[in-house]
């Protein structure tokens, strides 16, 4: 029989408590004796934000420095803005994107021999003041579609409305609060490849292999006007004109087709305003920017920029060696949501709504004091390119290398500072949106990653894969925040609602799933 050690005596317990107390008293003394450094805060455009200040290395956590910067800027609790910091290594052309647990060790590791007498430059990037929680459980599994779900998108107004397009030739609008179908949108005679809500949430557009575009009223489920006819082949993608640019009392819609053209439609009449022709291959993706430029990516390996008002070509970017699969704009999130933000306050008049949408766009797209959207293109050649369309030259800002297979999908974070890319190499990668530098790999899927979507606060990314799972990633750490099994087959489409409440997914198993915290 095993002999048990006797319990510690009162004296032993008292000595242990005293020893622990002594350690706790000494630890702060040791910690605060790390020395200090001088911090120079700059904004993302390189402008100095405050005077140089001295900070103790022991207190130099990202949270503490964020609080200090707010104090230096004279902000009260109402105006408080959380920041993340990029560290410029002195004497080297090196910027560390992820703030470390131990700043002193990081500087010494990179050869800064005397950090105590060195001024360290910290780029401060504002973070969202609201926080989105990682979705962690299945809210609803909603059957209804008779074939795989190919696309899904939440209404910009609320996560309680979701649209999906399917291989059963229908689109559907779902009530995600109750987990029930609201409307089945019938009319297409081919697969519905894309669904897209207008920025004000008052229309839903669908595009199909039947060569048509249709616009629906999501409140009644009825079609608005006749179907838009003009394309000769499948219609692959849609893009709404940004809300602040709507004119003549009508919205405009762009559609990209396998027939190598893009058409601009007047929504209230269904008339074609312009046909953008020039691509020599299928136009796989289209985006409508906040300065009335239209961006297209094609299987002819080019990315083109068009003037939406005149219908003329502005730039032709040719750098990719294979098909362009997807393109994204740094302003995508604010253009998709127009005047809807985390406050849920909707301006009363049309003029005020326009003004708010324009203000949100200009704030999101500003680089060095001027409005300049960035564009990123993803290709079958395993690469991505970052472009500045305001630059007249056709030279990219950066070439983003690292994927070992085709890059399927790409998205800017809502705050415009990061890029996430999903690839056939089973990985999702994060990149700096300013200079295109690689930041980290999000590895965990065991099959190609088809799509990715950001949370509205830019702190989380959700990915959908051929391996039948969704995964939620913490962007700061690069770690898996939540694994979401539940699909019975490949996950083709994923979206995160603009209000942060829900994630939706759909794929080969034909059922829509919504996920919540």
Swiss-Prot record:
Region (Disordered): 1-25
GO cellular component: nucleolus
Gene3D superfamilies, A to Z: YVTN repeat-like/Quinoprotein amine dehydrogenase
Classification via PROSITE patterns: WD_REPEATS_1, WD_REPEATS_2, WD_REPEATS_REGION
Pfam family, one: WD40
Spans annotated as Ubiquitin-like (UBL) domain: 34-128
Renumbered ranges of WD repeats: 144-184, 187-226, 230-277, 278-316, 351-397, 402-441, 444-483, 486-517
Compartment(s): Nucleus, Nucleolus
Source domain of life: Eukaryota
Keywords (A to Z) from UniProt: Nucleus, Repeat, Ribosome biogenesis, WD repeat
Single Gene Ontology BP annotation: ribosomal large subunit assembly
Cross-referenced CDD domains: WD40
SMART domains: WD40
Subunit architecture: Associates with the pre-60S ribosomal particle. Interacts (via WD repeats) with uL18. Interacts (via UBL domain) with MDN1 (via VWFA/MIDAS domain). Interacts (via WD repeats) with NSA2.
Function recorded in the entry: Involved in ribosome biogenesis. Required for processing and efficient intra-nuclear transport of pre-60S ribosomal subunits. Interacts with the AAA-ATPase Midasin, which is essential for the ATP-dependent dissociation of a group of nonribosomal factors from the pre-60S particle.
Similarity annotation: Belongs to the NLE1/RSA4 family.
PANTHER family noted in UniProt: NOTCHLESS PROTEIN HOMOLOG 1 (PTHR19848:SF0), WD40 REPEAT PROTEIN (PTHR19848)
Protein name: Ribosome assembly protein 4
Organism listed in the record: Chaetomium thermophilum (strain DSM 1495 / CBS 144.50 / IMI 039719)
């Amino acid at each position: 029989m095993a002999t048990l050690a006797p319990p510690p005596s009162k004296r032993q317990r008292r000595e242990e408590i005293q020893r622990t107390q002594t350690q706790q008293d000494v630890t702060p003394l040791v910690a605060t004796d790390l020395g200090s450094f001088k911090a120079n805060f700059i904004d993302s455009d390189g402008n100095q934000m405050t005077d140089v200040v001295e900070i103790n290395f022991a207190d130099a956590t990202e949270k503490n420095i964020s609080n200090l910067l707010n104090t230096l800027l004279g902000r009260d609790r109402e105006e408080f803005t959380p920041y993340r910091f990029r560290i410029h290594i002195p004497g080297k052309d090196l910027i560390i994107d992820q703030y470390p647990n131990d700043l002193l060790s990081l500087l010494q590791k990179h050869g800064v021999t005397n950090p105590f007498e060195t001024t360290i430059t910290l780029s401060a990037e504002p973070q969202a003041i609201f926080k989105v929680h990682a979705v962690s459980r299945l809210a609803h599994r909603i059957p209804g579609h008779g074939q795989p779900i190919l696309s899904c998108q939440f209404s910009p107004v609320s996560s309680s409305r979701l649209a999906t397009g399917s291989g059963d030739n229908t689109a559907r609008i779902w009530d995600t609060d109750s987990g029930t179908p609201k409307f089945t949108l019938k009319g297409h005679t081919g697969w519905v490849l894309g669904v897209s809500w207008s920025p004000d949430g008052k229309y839903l557009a669908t595009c199909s292999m039947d060569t048509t575009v249709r616009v629906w009223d999501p409140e009644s489920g009825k079609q608005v006007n006749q179907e838009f006819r003009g394309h000769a082949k499948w219609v692959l993608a849609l893009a709404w004109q940004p809300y602040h640019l709507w004119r003549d009392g009508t919205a405009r819609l762009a559609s990209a087709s396998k027939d190598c053209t893009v058409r601009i439609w007047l929504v209230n009449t269904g008339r074609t305003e312009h046909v953008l022709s020039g691509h020599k291959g299928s136009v796989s993706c289209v985006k409508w920017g906040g300065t009335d430029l239209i961006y297209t990516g094609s299987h002819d390996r080019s990315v083109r920029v068009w003037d939406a008002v005149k219908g003329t070509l502005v730039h032709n970017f040719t750098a990719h060696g294979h098909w362009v699969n997807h393109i994204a704009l740094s302003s995508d999130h604010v253009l998709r949501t127009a005047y809807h933000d985390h406050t849920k306050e909707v301006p009363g008049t049309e003029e005020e709504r326009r003004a708010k949408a324009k203000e949100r766009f200009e704030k999101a797209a500003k680089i060095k004091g001027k409005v300049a959207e960035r564009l990123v293109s993803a290709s079958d050649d395993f690469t991505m390119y970052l472009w500045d369309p305001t630059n007249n030259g056709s030279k990219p800002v950066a070439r983003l290398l690292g994927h070992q297979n085709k890059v399927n999908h790409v998205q800017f974070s809502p705050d415009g500072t990061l890029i996430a890319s999903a690839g056939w190499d089973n990985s999702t990668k994060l990149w700096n949106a300013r200079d295109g530098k690689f930041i980290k790999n999000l590895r965990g899927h065991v099959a190609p990653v088809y799509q990715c979507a950001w949370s509205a606060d830019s702190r989380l990314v959700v990915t959908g894969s051929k391996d039948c799972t969704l995964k939620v990633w913490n962007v700061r750490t690069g770690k898996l925040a939540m694994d979401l099994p539940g699909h019975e087959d490949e996950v083709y489409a994923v979206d995160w609602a603009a209000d942060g409440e829900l994630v939706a997914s759909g794929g080969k198993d034909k059922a829509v799933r919504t996920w919540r915290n």
